Amino acid sequence: MSNGIVIIGSGFAARQLVKNIRKQDASIPLTLIAADSMDEYNKPDLSHVISQGQRADDLTRQTAGEFAEQFNLRLFPHTWVTDIDAEAHVVKSQNNQWQYDKLVLATGASAFVPPVPGRELMLTLNSQQEYRACETQLRDARRVLIVGGGLIGSELAMDFCRAGKAVTLIDNAASILASLMPPEVSSRLQHRLTEMGVHLLLKSQLQGLEKTDSGILATLDRQRCIEVDAVIAATGLRPETALARRAGLTINRGVCVDSYLQTSNADIYALGDCAEINGQVLPFLQPIQLSAMVLAKNLLGNNTPLKLPAMLVKIKTPELPLHLAGETQRQDLRWQINTERQGMVARGVDDADQLRAFVVSEDRMKEAFGLLKTLSM
């Protein structure tokens, strides 16, 4: 009798995989094990919950029970997997164990919290569960400090500002979105955030946090202090690799997989935010969707390599939305920036004048698909 496929995790990657497997095989045994409730929600919505006035429970799209019934699954929510015996093909928790033929790690990534004194006062918004734990504090907060000016930090800064809160954003870099694009490209969004009232503290460092009678005192470099009611860490994600490491799998930044999503163990695969595909960590929806389609085929006996096209990344800042694609972080590109009242098109070209990256904003986002075709040629 087949032990089937065991998936550790219940986020977007795990659900996409289940849906793709069930399109091809209605009966192969599927077991999902996860530490959370396994209810479905749309994670990108977390960037807009405050301005939308949404509670954590409002985000639920489908309960775990409904998901299990729809796709013929065995679910084990609120269950911590403690160990994987790769040789015996067994996954273990404190009170249970499961045999598998094929195992998929879809353990996601956790929010990185800077190691400063008082770090326990920082909140993270990387899951519905995390938002549920702090939603009252965030709703009641008048003054909010966001640590990190990357994609999530910029989205949250705009959202909290739109909700009428006094927002300060701090980052070591000289510009926002510094790991994604050069300052001459991100400056349009940076200017818009400033216009809205976001206080940007760039080239600045958080040194510590301390609880006071009236809030939280944040100590910064250059002998500066500000008092706020809530502090959110938006300083990036770290792939969850501890379980894979204990199982003896090859780990780098994430769980290392090849083009077939296979780890260093032939019967164990990794997918989503925890996976490092041929040296790349790709924590975005489109590569996860494409990876899930390929992995479903491979788990069912095919041998299909993952081929990723040029893909759009969307920055959900409603007052000035951005789409980007290609190697926007490359240092050697020349940027041709066309700015008009209705939006911006920035093209990054190499020494041979080949388009290697682009960023488009506002009404000019409709030009993204034409540029994407050029990028893919």
Curated annotation (Swiss-Prot):
What subcellular compartments does it reside in?
Answer: Cytoplasm
The chain's coiled-coil residues are: none
What is this protein identified as? Nitric oxide reductase FlRd-NAD(+) reductase
According to its UniProt record, this protein's enzyme class is oxidoreductase
Q: Which is a Gene Ontology cellular component entry for this protein?
A: cytoplasm
Q: Which gene carries the instructions for this protein?
A: norW
Major localization listed first in the record, in broad terms: cytoplasm
Example GO molecular function term? oxidoreductase activity, acting on iron-sulfur proteins as donors, NAD or NADP as acceptor
**Database matches in Pfam families:** Pyr_redox_2, Rbx_binding
Which HAMAP family does the UniProt entry name for this protein?
A: NorW
**Species this protein is from:** Escherichia coli O1:K1 / APEC
Cofactor names = FAD
